[in-house]
Amino acid sequence: MPGGLLLGDEAPNFEANTTIGRIRFHDFLGDSWGILFSHPRDFTPVCTTELGRAAKLAPEFAKRNVKMIALSIDSVEDHLAWSKDINAYNGEEPKETLPFPIIDDKSRDLAIQLGMLDPAEKDEQGMPVTARVVFIFGPDKKLKLSILYPATTGRNFDEILRVIISLQLTAEKRVATPVDWKNGDSVMVLPNIPEEEAKKLFPKGVFTKELPSGKKYLRYTPQP
């Protein structure tokens, strides 16, 4: 795919038409964290379940200062009409608004710039549609995480929320989150922190797992 973003790249300050009007991306983000996520097409089954779950979790993202914005190659008019279906799927009033805007990228200009097109999935005209991409940007507008799923596999938005919590925690504290970590679980002390400094940084205690190598790199501490 042409285009695309690498970790640490700054988000392009694009302009786009959305379900809340025309936006400039950096102005939309402000000082918040941001999630930009694309889907293949409106009025399709997997996408409806995905955006339905994203809408359900929107309050959890909002209370963590995260702004959400979706994107596909459909028009604003289609986005608004489809939003009724998404709300109905969630068992709510079938209104045209969601807790986040959706970008109209009929031209595919943004999808090309951001490397979002799936060459294996095409529309009725034989043109590629957007894959299931997730970009997470920090308050500095730089890319902190990217996820790329094919059209046939829906994403787990609870996992995306878990990742946001980890990213925000590790941006503030000198820790890392281990496999299958959940909010409130113990975290790992970074291996470049000397033992004496670790004791001062983590007053709740540092617990080291003894290993056959004798190396003391598996160090846990309660979540700060």
Swiss-Prot record:
Positions of modified residues (N6-succinyllysine): K209
GO cellular component, one term: perinuclear region of cytoplasm
Catalysed transformations (reactions): a hydroperoxide + 2 glutathione = an alcohol + glutathione disulfide + H2O; a 1,2-diacyl-sn-glycero-3-phosphocholine + H2O = a 1-acyl-sn-glycero-3-phosphocholine + a fatty acid + H(+); a 1-acyl-sn-glycero-3-phosphocholine + an acyl-CoA = a 1,2-diacyl-sn-glycero-3-phosphocholine + CoA; 1-hexadecanoyl-sn-glycero-3-phosphocholine + hexadecanoyl-CoA = 1,2-dihexadecanoyl-sn-glycero-3-phosphocholine + CoA
Subunit annotation: Homodimer. Interacts with GSTP1; mediates PRDX6 glutathionylation and regeneration. Interacts with APEX1. Interacts with STH. May interact with FAM168B. May interact with HTR2A.
The protein, known as: Peroxiredoxin-6
Site residues, Important for phospholipase activity: S32
Annotated transmembrane regions: none
Residues with the Phosphothreonine modification: T44, T177
Processing and modification events after translation: Irreversibly inactivated by overoxidation of Cys-47 to sulfinic acid (Cys-SO(2)H) and sulfonic acid (Cys-SO(3)H) forms upon oxidative stress.
Keyword RNA-binding tagged: no
Spans annotated as Required and sufficient for targeting to lysosomes and lamellar bodies: 31-40
Protein task: Thiol-specific peroxidase that catalyzes the reduction of hydrogen peroxide and organic hydroperoxides to water and alcohols, respectively. Can reduce H(2)O(2) and short chain organic, fatty acid, and phospholipid hydroperoxides. Also has phospholipase activity, and can therefore either reduce the oxidized sn-2 fatty acyl group of phospholipids (peroxidase activity) or hydrolyze the sn-2 ester bond of phospholipids (phospholipase activity). These activities are dependent on binding to phospholipids at acidic pH and to oxidized phospholipds at cytosolic pH.
Compartments, record wording: Cytoplasm; Lysosome
Entry GO MF terms: 1-acylglycerophosphocholine O-acyltransferase activity; calcium-independent phospholipase A2 activity; glutathione peroxidase activity; identical protein binding; peroxidase activity; peroxiredoxin activity; phospholipase A2 activity; ubiquitin protein ligase binding
GO biological process terms held by the UniProt record: cell redox homeostasis; glycerophospholipid catabolic process; positive regulation of mRNA splicing, via spliceosome; response to oxidative stress
Active site residues according to the UniProt entry: C47 (cysteine sulfenic acid (-soh) intermediate), D140 (for phospholipase activity)
